[in-house]
């Protein structure tokens, strides 16, 4: 019974990935014969695929042997009811969007499903990670700490928010090729830089005190190149102190000029100004072009500069925070 339920969840997951990447794909419940005429296949609607995915998840959820979460590491690659709920939430929301709904109003359906998913996940032990355990290491920023954790499996894990995450690191050996080596700031001793946050991403983080956007969303910029921001006068934003008072997710995600960081156990700051320890440059493969570096999922203190290696946070496929956002979007619509 459990194996069959997991097969339904896995089929739902892979169909959802195909749907997101390639659009609607033929719905086939039986294997093809060797002489099958593939020219007879037809592409269904997005809604058809989404409902098929939701149905698979709901079949799996009926199993009394499929657990809500994994409790032992030797089952870390297996499926759960939590994963089924997350896929069910995503499939219905995507189908209801204007881009995919084919002119039909599916928001009531999506809202009903997402409300149920959120309620059942919360009732079965999932909760947001809101309290920082190591306040000194992560500056009392629970969001920063959360994405460095790799302990969501167990009967009472410290991370109860993660529904499903990668079992592997970003490289074959994360101890020799951790995140800071490929996307970190030079002050950490990075070997190369593969991505950098844009100014537009930085501008997207609201002000914490007011909850208002930094820019006037009716016209965020005064020019096509986005070099002249059009500030929201009611946000409380101070252009002379641009990083103060922002949504805490900003500090948890991005290194900016004067960001605090640990080199091993020694406190330091990231300097992105010309001449700084992680200066902005227009050439080379180690320094930012935008004045920002990626921080999310990096364990604070791990860095080549201090000779401290270790595993970073794994990529989350699904987490409760995302289900909250899905439910909120469906409710608003």
Model-inferred region functions:
Residues 328:
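Active-site-proximal region of nucleotide-activated glycan assembly enzymes
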Residues 220-319:
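Flexible, polar/acidic helix-loop-strand segments at domain edges
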Residues 167, 204, 208, 253:
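Residues that form generic nucleotide/phosphate-binding pockets
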Residues 65, 104-106, 140-143, 161, ...:
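Intrinsically disordered regions, especially transient/low-confidence alpha-helical propensity segments
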Residues 29-32, 70, 209, 254, ...:
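Solvent-exposed, flexible loop/coil residues
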